[in-house]
């Protein structure tokens, strides 16, 4: 159970692919102009990570070490092609919006990295969980960045959600404030870099506060009964 918890915590927070490893920044910065696009690509990446980790882990004993990387890429490309056709069939609007960034998941460092670092060494169940956790960590980072950019740039949230979830999702669109001219800095790549930098700073501050609390709690436990540690 502790190993399962560690895999989940590492994927979602401690070893977050976007905020700690800084992998996959090209789609992270390019696609997160809206929350819908960010969520769509994040979920697609999560599905690819889960399925590829599961497949590679299952076949790890039959994969020759000398040619393992080409085999990994072939498996990843097959899964990405299937996911691309799935999005094309059931979410065509999102497919058009994401464009080239769906097939580019094949070259995403996150996917290849987890295949080599985790799936090739661990069992199928734990590898699938690792892929799901890493994918959801990246999805959360993309969704937060996409939401911030959409709100600041357009004053809306979940604009175009029907492209991802169907026509019923039009009711999810929220207009937070009305603007006649979008704030282009937030919608263009410089805004993505600024937003990512703020998120990195925010995560660092949270980690430092959590570390300080753990240190203080450990110091209090180490003191004899009745002592407060004050001179």
Curated annotation (Swiss-Prot):
- What general EC class does the enzyme of this chain belong to? translocase
Q: Report which superkingdom the organism of origin falls in.
A: Bacteria
Listed A to Z, the keywords are:
Cell inner membrane, Cell membrane, Electron transport, Membrane, Translocase, Transmembrane, Transmembrane helix, Transport
Q: How does it sit in the membrane?
A: Multi-pass membrane protein
Q: How does it assemble?
A: The complex is composed of six subunits: RsxA, RsxB, RsxC, RsxD, RsxE and RsxG.
Q: Which family does it belong to?
A: Belongs to the NqrDE/RnfAE family.
Q: What is this protein called?
A: Ion-translocating oxidoreductase complex subunit E
Q: Which organism is it from?
A: Escherichia coli O127:H6 (strain E2348/69 / EPEC)
């Amino acid at each position: 159970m502790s190993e399962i918890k560690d895999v989940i915590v590492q994927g979602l927070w401690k070893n977050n692919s976007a905020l700690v490893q800084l992998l996959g920044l090209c789609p992270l910065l390019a696609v997160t102009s809206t929350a819908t696009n960010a969520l769509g690509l994040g979920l697609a990446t999560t599905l690819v990570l889960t399925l590829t980790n599961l497949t590679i882990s299952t076949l790890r004993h039959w994969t020759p070490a000398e040619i393992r990387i080409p085999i990994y890429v072939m498996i990843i490309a097959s899964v990405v092609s299937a996911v691309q056709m799935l999005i094309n069939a059931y979410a065509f609007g999102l497919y058009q919006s994401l464009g080239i960034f769906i097939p580019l998941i094949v070259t995403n460092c996150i996917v290849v990295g987890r295949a080599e670092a985790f799936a090739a060494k661990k069992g199928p169940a734990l590898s699938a969980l690792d892929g799901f956790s890493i994918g959801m960590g990246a999805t959360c980072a993309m969704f937060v960045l996409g939401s911030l950019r959409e709100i600041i740039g357009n004053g809306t949230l979940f604009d175009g959600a029907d492209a991802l979830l169907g026509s019923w999702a039009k009711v999810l669109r929220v207009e937070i404030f009305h603007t006649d001219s979008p704030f282009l800095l937030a919608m263009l790549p410089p805004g993505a870099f600024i937003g990512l930098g703020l998120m990195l700073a925010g995560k660092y501050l949270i980690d430092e506060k959590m570390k300080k609390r753990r240190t203080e709690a450990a110091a209090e436990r180490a003191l004899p009964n009745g002592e407060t540690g004050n001179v």
